[in-house]
Every structure is written in structure tokens, then in C-alpha cells.
């Protein structure tokens, strides 16, 4: 019986730091102070981003161009599937009433192709 106990002990892993390594456990400690700080910091960040987005959206200009009648020949050309390889171009010139900032370039006249 003693031989059997020795035989079982010899099959166990070595008791070394390499074989049986204990890693420290990392736990997050949430305190009320930390949670409230993160909550309010996130709220202030979102508020600032919202203000920036609202201010940048105010300077947006929208132009609506109706090209239904002007480019009607292209629509008729595409109704027939055999005309898939034929090219159709439609050009509509338009003008902006005021100056528009595009990066560092100011343009007062644009053309849509």
C-alpha cells in the first residue's frame, strides 16, 4: 500500500513556480465616487460633442435641383435594355447666391455633371 501511495505521488506535477503559477486576480473596484465621475464626465463629453455638431450643422446649405424634365432623354434611353452600352450625359448649370466655404477654397459658381 505504501508503494502504491509513492507511485501516485510521483504522478503529481512538480511543485515549482513554473508548473503551478498563480496569477494575481484583477478586480475592478467600483466606488460611488468613481462611478459618478465617469457618469458626469461622459455626459459632459456628449454635451460638448452635441454642441459642436449643432453649430456645424447650422452652416450647412442645401440646394435642390429638379432634373426630371432636363434629363428625360437619358431616362427614355435606359428604358430599352439594348441601349445599355450607349452613353448619356446630362449637364445642369447652377449658381449659388452667396459665397460658400469649402476648406480654404471659396467658390461662387459650381457646375453639376
UniProtKB/Swiss-Prot annotation:
Record topological domains on the Cytoplasmic side: 1-34
InterPro entries: CDC50/LEM3_fam
Subcellular localization, as worded in the UniProt entry: Membrane
Extracellular side: 56-113
GO cellular component, one term: membrane
Topology in the lipid bilayer: Single-pass membrane protein
Entry's transmembrane regions: 35-55
Superkingdom, natural source: Eukaryota
Main location: membrane
Tissue-wise expression: Specifically expressed in testis.
Keywords: Glycoprotein, Membrane, Transmembrane, Transmembrane helix
UniProt keyword Transferase, yes or no: no
Glycosylation sites: 66
UniProt-listed PANTHER family: CELL CYCLE CONTROL PROTEIN 50, CELL CYCLE CONTROL PROTEIN 50C
Family the entry assigns: Belongs to the CDC50/LEM3 family.
Stated name of the protein: Cell cycle control protein 50C
Organism in which the protein naturally occurs: Homo sapiens
Amino acid at each position: 500500500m505504501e508503494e502504491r501511495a509513492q507511485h501516485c505521488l510521483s504522478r503529481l506535477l512538480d511543485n515549482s513556480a513554473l508548473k503551478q503559477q498563480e496569477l494575481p486576480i484583477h478586480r475592478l473596484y467600483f466606488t460611488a465616487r468613481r462611478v459618478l465621475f465617469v457618469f458626469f464626465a461622459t455626459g459632459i463629453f456628449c454635451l460638448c460633442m452635441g454642441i459642436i455638431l449643432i453649430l456645424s450643422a447650422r452652416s450647412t446649405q442645401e440646394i435642390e435641383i429638379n432634373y426630371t424634365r432636363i434629363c428625360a432623354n437619358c431616362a427614355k434611353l435606359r428604358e430599352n435594355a439594348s441601349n445599355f452600352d450607349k452613353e448619356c450625359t446630362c449637364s445642369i448649370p447652377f449658381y449659388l447666391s452667396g459665397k460658400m466655404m469649402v476648406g480654404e477654397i471659396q467658390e461662387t459658381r459650381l457646375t453639376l455633371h
